[in-house]
């Protein structure tokens, strides 16, 4: 009887606790489900990005500091200037990620160009232009430029003031249909400083490396959620991975590649359950190096049947690759996190529906890691060329990295965390109500 009485007295508080927990679990479940629909998310800018306004001339250019990330914007036909104060020993790398706003239209030749110039408008080591390409689908694209210290072809070798020039490129309005949107693009600027070597070495690129196309990995794919920007990229290692991607969506992944290792990747877009037609460039996969410099990209058409695209063979990571004239080789000059960026054209929805569509990534990292070059100082940020930085990265058959969220990205884990905090808070409150109610029932009525 005592036990029955206790359960009867606790019945109402238990009901309260159960009701609250069920409601909270339902809310958490709906939040997680919403995160898993594959709905395109806006670009995830670095949380610590400093807002900065580009100047229309060099006189008012704002100084950028190494190791920092900045957020700016670039208008139509825009040309903006930012200032660098450089020494005579370090290499400076600047990358600008252009992000068209939702609903924008872009043409094949629309893009962003980045260069570093001296006080006489002379271009320094390199400048690049990133285009949206044949997909004509708005998505984040990044271009990079540098001031490098070295012999021969290198200019801008002295310490002093230099300028980053970010330009918006476009074809004449009369040559494209529909015309590009005049809206401003958001910009994310990153600045990395690389120290000189302790001892000067070779100044020519390696002439011999294994350029045969590697076999794509086989095996069951494990789920891994891509991020919505460079700073939220999902961690991958060697293995077969799967995700979902919706038309108009861009997914970011990062893969650690050490000195002497050779990277390769294949992306596969799964078959559609309906629709018809053909798109010449539906899926685009791009590879960026640790300073967000474009190394290579590849595209694939789509007719509703499964399609795949593989990067052309890349050389092992070597310091001396920088002396090559081919971007695909010279870009593989650093150890660190390499970024796989996958975009599915928005126009796919018109022919095959809103998705999400199945995406499989087959990632290889061949070769043993070797000791890197002896730098005379530290890079800024200091861990940018360290592939072991951060959470342990999963390899085929290995462990899922801590903090990566397993098969989910940071957004889902934040939702789970918020749900967990909410559940815990409500549980504590409910238990408090239960305790008070139980004490009142246990107290003699004459009290």
PLM ranges: what are they?
Residues 69-71, 103-145, 278-315:
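Surface-exposed beta-strand/loop patches in noncatalytic accessory domains
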Residues 418-447:
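C-terminal membrane-anchoring or membrane-association module
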């Amino acid at each position: 009887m005592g036990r029955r009485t206790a359960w009867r007295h606790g019945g109402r508080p238990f009901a309260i606790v159960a009701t609250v927990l069920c409601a909270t679990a339902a809310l958490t479940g709906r939040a997680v489900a919403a995160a898993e629909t594959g709905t395109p998310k806006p670009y995830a800018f670095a949380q610590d990005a400093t807002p900065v306004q580009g100047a229309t001339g060099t006189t008012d250019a704002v100084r950028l500091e190494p190791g920092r990330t900045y957020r700016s914007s670039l208008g139509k036909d825009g040309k903006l200037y930012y200032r660098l104060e450089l020494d005579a020993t370090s290499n400076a790398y600047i990358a600008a990620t252009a992000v068209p706003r939702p609903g924008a239209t872009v043409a094949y030749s629309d893009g962003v160009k980045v260069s570093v110039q001296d006080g006489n408008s002379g271009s320094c080591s390199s400048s690049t232009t990133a285009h949206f390409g044949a997909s004509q689908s708005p998505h984040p694209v990044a271009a990079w430029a540098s001031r490098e210290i070295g012999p021969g072809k290198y200019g801008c070798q002295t310490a002093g003031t230099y300028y980053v020039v970010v330009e918006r490129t476009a074809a004449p309005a009369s040559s494209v249909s529909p015309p590009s949107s005049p809206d401003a693009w958001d910009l994310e600027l990153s600045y990395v400083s690389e120290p000189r070597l302790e001892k000067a070495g070779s100044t020519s690129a390696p002439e011999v490396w294994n350029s045969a196309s590697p076999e794509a990995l086989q095996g069951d794919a494990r789920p891994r959620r891509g991020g919505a920007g460079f700073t939220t990229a999902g961690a991958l290692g060697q293995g077969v991975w799967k995700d979902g991607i919706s038309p108009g969506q861009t997914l970011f992944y990062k893969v650690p590649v050490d000195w002497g290792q050779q990277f390769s990747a294949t992306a596969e877009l799964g078959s559609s359950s309906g629709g018809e037609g053909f798109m010449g460039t539906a899926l685009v996969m791009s590879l960026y190096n640790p300073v967000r410099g474009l190394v290579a990209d590849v595209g694939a058409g789509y007719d509703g049947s499964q399609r795949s695209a593989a990067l052309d063979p890349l050389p092992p990571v070597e310091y001396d690759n920088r002396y090559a004239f081919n971007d695909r080789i010279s870009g593989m000059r650093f150890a660190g996190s390499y970024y796989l960026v996958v975009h599915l054209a928005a126009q796919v929805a018109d022919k095959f529906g809103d998705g999400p569509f199945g995406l499989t990534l087959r990632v290889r990292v061949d070769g043993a890691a070797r000791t890197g070059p002896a730098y005379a100082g530290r890079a800024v940020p200091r861990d940018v060329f360290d592939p072991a930085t951060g959470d342990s990265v999963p390899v085929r058959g290995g462990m899922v990295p801590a903090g990566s969220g397993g098969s989910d990205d940071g957004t889902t884990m934040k939702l789970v965390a918020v749900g967990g905090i909410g559940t815990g808070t409500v549980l504590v409150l409910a238990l408090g109500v239960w305790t008070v109610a139980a004490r009142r029932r246990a107290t003699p009525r004459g009290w």
